[in-house]
Swiss-Prot record:
It comes from Citrobacter koseri (strain ATCC BAA-895 / CDC 4225-83 / SGSC4696). This is Cytidine deaminase. The gene is cdd. PROSITE patterns: CYT_DCMP_DEAMINASES_1, CYT_DCMP_DEAMINASES_2. The lineage of its organism: Bacteria, Pseudomonadati, Pseudomonadota, Gammaproteobacteria, Enterobacterales. Signal peptide: none annotated. Zn(2+) binds at H102, C129, C132.
Length: 294
């Protein structure tokens, strides 16, 4: 078990601990639960779906990287496939506050990059901020997404974001978590191809500036992130943050990164290179390259 889970795990009910122990045994537990695992945990713990999600929130919050605020937020995105995806907020010392990943973004980005096609609900241990409410409004689940908070009855995003502005106001038809393939040819080595593949699935209907990032760890594991734009612009999630999020959720740390590749167009209206390189260098990675999309 990864050390970050030990405190939260020890506070769970005994029957839930027994059911979770085999799942968490891998130090690189991927911070997600398959539909089958969720069913097993419900059966062994006697908890219904909502109660189980609340019980597991401390494990999601344990994934947070909060070197600045020391305020851990955890989220669990529940996919329409039945798979659950953990998320935790991330802060990056030496970078800028704008590079921060919120817990809801972490869980949602996690689900999207794992290939989930839509979300039914999200469970969070603190009220979503306005930034996250706007981020969630980019999803194909729209304002019907259910939000579960401790001590409150569930509400939809519509309740938390009245008079909402979103992609439909800009006549955007393809939404975040809809399947997308921008058709860039895969070329180069495995890491370069992974970055291009990440760019192929990015969501960029406002700037038409595709980008993707691939990070290679010292053990050869590769994590990718795809660019995810938002109708309100500022809640946009850069591709590096998506990749760092997956790396962290899988139990890796920044010193594990040995190489990074950014894929983007040289003539795109928005360029990720400077921000990507600056953040990676702040985290100790200097082996950074860029491949230009055709």
């Amino acid at each position: 078990m990864h050390p970050r889970f030990q405190t939260a795990f020890g506070q769970l009910a005994d029957n839930l601990q027994s059911a979770l122990a085999p799942i968490l045994a891998d130090e690189h537990f991927p911070a997600m639960l398959t539909a089958e695992q969720v069913s097993t945990l419900k059966r062994e713990s006697g908890l219904d779906e909502d109660a189980l999600a609340f019980a597991l929130l401390p494990l999601a919050a344990a994934c947070a990287r909060t070197d600045l605020s020391h305020f851990n937020v955890g989220a669990i995105a529940r996919g329409i496939s039945g798979t659950w995806y953990f998320g935790g907020n991330m802060e990056f010392l030496g970078a800028t506050m704008q590079q921060t990943v919120h817990a809801e973004q972490s869980a949602i980005g996690h689900a999207w990059l794992r290939g989930e096609k839509g979300l039914a609900a999200i469970t969070v241990n603190y009220t979503p901020c306005g930034h996250c409410r706007q981020f969630m409004n980019e999803l194909n689940s729209g304002l019907d997404l259910r939000i579960h908070l401790p001590g409150r009855v569930p509400h939809t995003l519509r309740d938390y974001l009245p008079d909402a502005f979103g992609p439909k106001d800009l006549e955007i038809k393809t939404l975040l978590m809809d399947e997308q393939d921008h058709g860039f040819a895969l070329e180069g080595d495995a890491l370069t191809q992974a970055a291009i593949a990440a760019a192929n699935k990015c969501h960029m209907p406002y700037s038409y500036s595709p980008s993707g990032v691939a990070l290679e760890c010292k053990d050869g594991r590769i994590f990718t992130g795809s660019y995810a734009e938002n109708a309100a612009f500022n809640p946009t999630l850069p591709p590096l943050q998506g990749a760092l999020n997956l790396l962290n959720l899988n139990g890796y740390d920044y010193p594990d990164i040995q190489r990074a590749i950014l894929a983007e167009k040289a003539d795109a209206p928005l360029i990720q290179w400077d921000a990507t390189a600056a953040t990676l260098k702040a985290l100790g990675c200097n082996n950074i390259d860029r491949v230009l999309l055709g």
